[in-house]
Amino acid sequence: MKIDRDAPVGVFDSGIGGLTVAREIMRNLPAEKIVYFGDTARVPYGSKSRETIIGYSRQIIRFLKEQKVKAIVVACNTASAFALEAVQEEFDIPILGVIEAGAKVAAQVTRNKRVGIIGTEGTVGSGIHAEVLKKIDPEITVIGKPCPLFVPLVEEGWTHDPVTVEVASRYLRELQEKDIDTLILGCTHYPLLRSTIGQIMGDGVTLVNPAYETALELGRLLKEQNMQSTGQGQSDFPYRFYVSDLAEKFKGFANSILPFDVEKTQKIDIEKY
């Protein structure tokens, strides 16, 4: 299959969280075009079954392939945990997740080999971060804590609200007591709560945001497979945004997260795929 090097990269998430990954791709791979899909009609993914998440991911990948993308980033930890292996086997296109990149960094930066992971119930319950970390260093102890209210709070725009601070304090208390020195933000929504989480955990805990490392991993993949954009045919605005619901609300969030104003977000019927 001949690949168009100047085709866009597809990025998808359950909602707005994957924009933190898209932002890092824009910063680190500025020549690459991006097609972003946020599944805002079905957010959050964290409380849904493996079979449901795989089904959602298949639909989204079919849509992104219709947009002629050359590679896909699953910018959602829950979908990476539950669906990545299945869709990599099923589709003839390079597909990256966000879990391994964060785990590798956490293993490098921890000093006392006690690593915390916060994420949705699905991500933490899957044990995937512990599995990856133990492969890198069997001596690492992994303490997981589901934080199911974080995604709805972020999607509501309450990133600095006193309610969010109170919820975060309750969730993170357990991790504070476990003497971790490294904390993986195991959901792409969570970097939007970084200041609140960092304030609660204190300077002694390193926060790992897998978004940056995922962008670098994508860059390596594109280089290895000779798929880097040549920069030819670059439009004035090389990014397209699609959602399954609430297009205007999504656009408002995107404008606060990305370094430019998103002029158009298109709602599509993802169930058709």
Predicted regions and their residues:
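Non-catalytic structural scaffold of enzyme domains
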Residues: 1-273
